[in-house]
Protein backbone atom coordinates (compact mmCIF):
# COMPACT_ATOMS: atom_id res chain seq x y z
CA UNK A 1 0.00 0.00 0.00
CA UNK A 2 1.29 3.47 -0.87
CA UNK A 3 1.86 5.96 1.92
CA UNK A 4 -0.21 9.15 1.45
CA UNK A 5 2.91 11.21 2.23
CA UNK A 6 4.37 10.00 -1.08
CA UNK A 7 1.94 12.35 -2.85
CA UNK A 8 3.20 15.43 -0.98
CA UNK A 9 6.27 17.47 -1.84
CA UNK A 10 9.04 17.77 0.71
CA UNK A 11 10.13 21.21 1.89
CA UNK A 12 13.22 20.93 -0.32
CA UNK A 13 11.08 20.04 -3.36
CA UNK A 14 8.75 22.98 -2.69
CA UNK A 15 11.76 25.30 -2.55
CA UNK A 16 13.15 23.80 -5.77
CA UNK A 17 9.79 24.31 -7.47
CA UNK A 18 9.63 27.93 -6.34
CA UNK A 19 13.15 28.57 -7.69
CA UNK A 20 12.22 27.02 -11.04
CA UNK A 21 9.05 29.10 -11.18
CA UNK A 22 11.04 32.30 -10.73
CA UNK A 23 13.60 31.22 -13.32
CA UNK A 24 10.99 30.30 -15.93
CA UNK A 25 8.98 33.49 -15.50
CA UNK A 26 11.55 35.14 -17.77
CA UNK A 27 11.29 32.63 -20.64
CA UNK A 28 9.49 33.50 -23.86
CA UNK A 29 6.69 31.29 -25.20
CA UNK A 30 8.92 29.17 -27.47
CA UNK A 31 11.41 28.49 -24.68
CA UNK A 32 8.55 27.60 -22.35
CA UNK A 33 7.04 25.14 -24.85
CA UNK A 34 10.45 23.55 -25.48
CA UNK A 35 11.06 23.18 -21.77
CA UNK A 36 7.60 21.67 -21.24
CA UNK A 37 8.14 19.12 -24.01
CA UNK A 38 11.57 18.19 -22.67
CA UNK A 39 10.13 17.78 -19.19
CA UNK A 40 7.28 15.59 -20.46
CA UNK A 41 9.77 13.40 -22.32
CA UNK A 42 11.82 12.95 -19.13
CA UNK A 43 8.67 12.05 -17.18
CA UNK A 44 7.72 9.46 -19.82
CA UNK A 45 11.21 7.93 -19.71
CA UNK A 46 11.04 7.81 -15.90
CA UNK A 47 7.63 6.10 -16.11
CA UNK A 48 9.05 3.55 -18.55
CA UNK A 49 11.98 2.84 -16.22
CA UNK A 50 9.67 2.40 -13.22
CA UNK A 51 7.36 0.13 -15.21
CA UNK A 52 10.32 -1.97 -16.37
CA UNK A 53 11.76 -2.21 -12.86
CA UNK A 54 8.40 -3.28 -11.46
CA UNK A 55 7.89 -5.85 -14.21
CA UNK A 56 11.34 -7.33 -13.68
CA UNK A 57 11.01 -7.41 -9.89
CA UNK A 58 7.75 -9.37 -10.07
CA UNK A 59 9.25 -12.15 -12.18
CA UNK A 60 10.79 -15.14 -10.35
From Swiss-Prot:
SUPFAM superfamilies: NblA-like. Pfam families: NblA. InterPro entries: NblA, NblA_sf. To Synechococcus PCC 7942 NblA and some, to chloroplast ycf18. This is Phycobilisome degradation protein NblA homolog 2.
